[in-house]
A protein has these predicted regions:
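A cytosolic small-molecule/anion-sensing beta-strand core signal
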Residues: 50, 200-201
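A structure-centric signal for secondary-structure junctions around beta-strands
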Residues: 43, 194-195
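Cysteine-centric redox/oxidoreductase cores and disulfide-bonded domains
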Residues: 86-194, 201-203, 208-212, 219-222
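Extracytoplasmic thiol/disulfide redox context detector
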Residues: 2-92, 115, 125, 184, ...
Length: 222
């Protein structure tokens, strides 16, 4: 038996799997602050505009996350860019938290808040008038901290390895808030109608706001 040859073939297979896994795990931050998952030099770039208070965005993430990343991103032929279209103060607070800390933490922060959206949006719908008043008065940092307290964001971030001072630093990061505002302004400038919305290689996909429709577009182009 040719054990060296068999071992070499097995090693090649393992290296191929590792390479595919590396593309799926690769995350790059663009100059605008958006996050690019996969091969940054991929021939095709899919851009997703996301709002954390958008229920359709949470639905899309549940339906599309695995097939999109494991089928399309893993190959290295397509990269996924996540940009923010901030539509309200809660959305801004969550976006600041998903972007909190090292870039490597973004994707799981992003997924955690989307998967738990029903719980924290449910809390937002049942807060008292006094609590809501804290969200709209005082310095921006104090307003965001009040939201984080009332909606359970400190506990969510603690489970992700952040202590309260680290969360407070991110909620006070006005440079980050400005980058998120710039991404939102860019979305408005190019005519993004709402979230989720998608671009392929910079071209806005009209009428494409769910996984079924997007998947058909991807199959037609790749």
């Amino acid at each position: 038996m040719h054990f060296p040859k068999i071992a070499a073939l097995a090693l090649c297979a393992l290296l191929a799997i590792a390479a595919r896994g590396d593309w799926n795990a690769r995350l790059t931050v663009s100059p605008s602050g958006s996050h690019i998952i996969g091969n940054p030099a991929a021939a095709t770039r899919l851009t997703e505009y996301i709002s954390y208070t958008c229920s359709h965005c949470a639905d899309f993430d549940r339906q599309a996350s695995d097939p999109l990343r494991l089928v399309y991103v893993t190959s290295g032929k397509l990269s996924l860019e996540i940009r923010h279209l901030v539509r309200d103060p809660i959305d801004l607070a969550v976006a600041m938290l998903t972007n909190c800390g090292p870039p490597a933490k973004f994707l799981q922060n992003h997924t955690t808040f989307l998967r738990q959206q029903a719980q924290w949006l449910g809390r937002a719908g049942s807060v008292s008038p006094g609590q809501k008043a804290r969200w709209s008065s005082g310095p921006a940092m104090a307003r965001r901290r009040a939201m984080a307290d009332d909606l359970g964001f400190y506990q969510t971030m603690q489970a992700r390895g952040y202590d309260r001072p680290a969360v407070d630093r991110c909620l006070a990061d006005e440079a980050m808030a400005s980058r998120l505002a710039e991404q939102t302004d860019e979305a408005v400038r190019i005519g993004v109608p709402g979230t989720p919305s998608f671009l392929i290689d910079g071209e806005l996909l009209t009428g494409t706001h769910d996984w079924q429709t997007l998947q058909a577009q991807l199959k037609a182009r790749l």
